[in-house]
Design a protein with these regions (language model features):
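An N-cap/entry alpha-helix motif that binds or orients negatively charged groups
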Residues: 1-67
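N-terminal small/glycine-rich loop or linker at the start of catalytic domains
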Residues: 42-63, 96-102, 147, 245-256
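Hydrophobic faces of well-ordered beta-strands that scaffold small-molecule active sites
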Residues: 50-54, 84-86, 111-114, 134-136, ...
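N-terminal active-site wall of soluble small-molecule enzyme domains
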Residues: 60-154, 161, 169-172, 198-201, ...
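Catalytic cores of alpha/beta
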Residues: 118-130, 165-176, 213-235, 240, ...
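Glycine-rich phosphate-binding active-site loops on the catalytic face of alpha/beta enzymes
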Residues: 125-144, 182-192, 229-252, 276-288, ...
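Active-site/ligand-binding-proximal alpha/beta "capping" segment
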Residues: 178-258, 376-413, 422-425
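C-terminal helical cap(s) of enzyme catalytic domains, especially alpha/beta-barrels
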Residues: 195-205, 227, 239-260, 293-302, ...
Length: 452
């Protein structure tokens, strides 16, 4: 143990001694009662588990979330998490034990105290502040320390997340009969990230051990792929760095998905509640899903999706007016708009409004080399055909700024998601008739996307 980790642990020993003076164990130990929230049960089962983390700062990134409100964060996480992790280290993560009860009060899930635990005092303190589980790191503890600390936690019905970061620690975790093993993809000695650590270490753990992949997971594509190796994920920074936390969680758990062709307020509500991030409003008069500005305003008022206006060869002035009047998150161009058109649009469009370009895929993949285009939507033909193109064309492509469209529904959305696109664009495949979205079909596609 050296470098960053050694310094953190040395400082933690100083902190523990100071805290013992300030808040002696004898002053609160008789108020510490065993928890009723079972960490092990919360992570068990066939569905991939998510431990979502409340994290204000870190040594590698500095301040991550300036507007850090643990109760508000828990209010979002409680809809998605299996358990919630709370950073309690003060010096390096700007954490606090005071955050634990704030989160526990809002969310019914087990709360994990994320600290560099080296002393039984910290476990009693964590439970006193309403934690239901604690982190024990084999990079920090020898076997005897681990057994002692684990026994204290279990005496309070608390769960233990046993963290390993290499083969030697993994072998120790197996010998120590750890129930939940977290494989840290970050090397705390030099702060580097390697997702291969999960791929190589996880298969060594036997049946009955819950494997959690920690650190460096940012995308739905990574989650889907690593879910073959791990039973769950601990995710913090990838969520905390986004202002819209709800959308950030959806992006990682489900993908960056859009429901296009919304015409009625109730459809937007179902799309949002099911897990969509974007809602598409079509301003192409010939489309059976076309809306006027008043209809669009009614849809927008009904649900807090990020709204995308869809246009085809419209005058630049019209696109800009709609984007401003409706506070659109993006405009999607579905016609023959070229670089000159896009440059003119970008010059006048509010800075926060993205430009998306739909591309028709035939026998080959068209180039994606336009300036000022934030995302591409790959579709079969001019869109709205309900037909898919040959997805094998996507193999080996960088698709991080691509949404996939064309005939997507519950029967093929998983195959589409495996392409590695940032997200999927649903339309006709979730309708009962053109322009009328079907609530059960919408719910079904998002349940299917989450079934991994």
């Amino acid at each position: 143990m050296q470098t960053v980790l050694a310094k953190i642990v040395a400082d933690k020993a100083i902190w523990v001694e100071a805290r013992k003076q300030q808040q002696p164990l004898a002053s609160f130990q008789n108020e510490v009662v065993p928890t009723q929230r079972n960490f092990y049960d919360a992570l068990a089962g066939t569905r991939t588990a998510f431990i979502l983390e409340c994290k204000k700062a870190s040594p590698s990134k500095g301040l991550i979330r300036e507007d850090f409100d643990p109760a508000a964060i828990a209010g979002v996480y409680k809809h998605y998490a299996s358990a919630i992790s709370v950073l309690c280290d003060e010096k390096y993560f700007q954490g606090s034990f005071d955050f634990l009860p704030m989160v526990s009060k809002v969310a019914p899930q087990p709360i994990l105290c994320k600290d560099f635990t080296i002393d039984p005092y910290q476990i009693y303190l964590a439970r006193y502040y309403q934690a239901d589980a604690c982190l024990l790191m084999l990079s920090v503890l020898d076997d005897e320390q681990y057994r002692q600390l684990s026994a204290v936690a279990h005496s309070l019905n608390m769960g233990v997340l046993t963290e390993v970061s290499n083969e030697e620690e993994l072998e120790r975790a197996i010998a120590l009969k750890a129930k939940v093993v977290g494989i840290n993809n970050r090397d705390l000695r030099d702060m580097s990230i390697d997702l291969n650590r999960t791929r190589t270490l996880a298969p060594r753990l036997g049946h009955g051990v819950t494997v959690i992949s920690e650190s460096g997971i940012h995308t739905y594509a990574e989650v889907r792929e690593l879910s073959h190796f791990a039973n769950g994920f601990l995710i913090g920074s990838a969520l905390m760095e986004h202002d819209d936390l709800n959308a950030a969680v959806k992006r990682v758990l489900l993908g960056e998905n859009k429901v296009c062709g919304l015409t009625r307020p109730q459809e937007a509500q179902v799309a949002y509640e099911s897990g969509a991030i974007y809602g598409g409003l079509i301003f192409v008069p010939t489309s059976p899903r076309a809306v006027n500005e008043a209809q669009a305003q009614a849809v927008i008022a009904s649900a807090p999706l990020s709204y995308v206006g869809v246009f085809r060869n419209s005058p630049v002035a019209e696109v800009i007016a709609r984007a401003k009047n409706l506070s659109l998150a993006a405009v999607q161009l579905h016609g023959s708009e070229d670089q000159t058109y896009i440059d003119a649009l970008r010059a006048e469009l509010p800075g926060k409004v993205q430009i998306w370009k739909a591309l028709s895929v035939g026998e080959t993949l068209p180039p994606r080399n336009l300036n000022h285009v934030d995302k591409y939507v790959l579709d079969n033909g001019q869109g709205g055909t309900g037909q898919r193109f040959d997805w094998s064309l996507l193999q080996g492509q960088d698709l991080r700024n691509v949404l996939l469209a064309g005939g997507l529904g519950a029967d093929n959305c998983v195959e589409a998601a495996k392409s590695g696109c940032a997200g999927l664009d649903f339309n006709s495949g979730v309708e009962s008739q053109p322009g009328i979205k079907d609530a059960s079909k919408l719910a079904s596609v998002f349940q299917t996307l989450r079934a991994y």
